[in-house]
Amino acid sequence: DAGDAVVDYIEHVLFASALPPEEVAAVMLEPIQGEGGYIVPPPHFLPRLRKLCDEHGILLIADEVQSGVGRTGKWWAIQHWDVEPDILCSAKGIASGVPLGLMVARQSVIKKWPAGAHGNTYGGNPLACVAALKTLELVENGMMENAAKMGEYILDALAEMQARHPSMGDVRGKGLMIGVEF
């Protein structure tokens, strides 16, 4: 599939002729591409990319700013492919649009980051923290399951419309992260 072709290209073309893997610190991606049209990757792409990163000691960073916090029916979109990133970043959805960011990482990554190495002058905003707590409460009380259920319903309805309307192109998505081409 296309995902295999991309990973093969990275390994056999980019790494072989343009950029040695030992010079690559990390691969950062959106598990479901947001601004590019809600592009859902082929089934084998993320697992193969995870394996490639592991083979070369490259960190895999998941940008879940748009796709995270239950929007796709799972806490994080990358979970649809049973892939665990080394670092995961999120924002927006974690506090229902109130400015707040989140970064989590494997212990093996965090232990290399000394205490005090990361800080800011505007952290701990009480409003953002309350918004995040309420958002997490909603997610834990069925929002994520509802996103999965409603996403299936909407994708099925769009597929039926697509069969009747030739102006509709591709219909794709996970949960409530849905894209339609016209």
Enumerate the predicted regions with their spans.
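Conserved N-terminal phosphate-binding loop of PLP-dependent enzymes in the Aspartate aminotransferase
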Residues: D1-F182
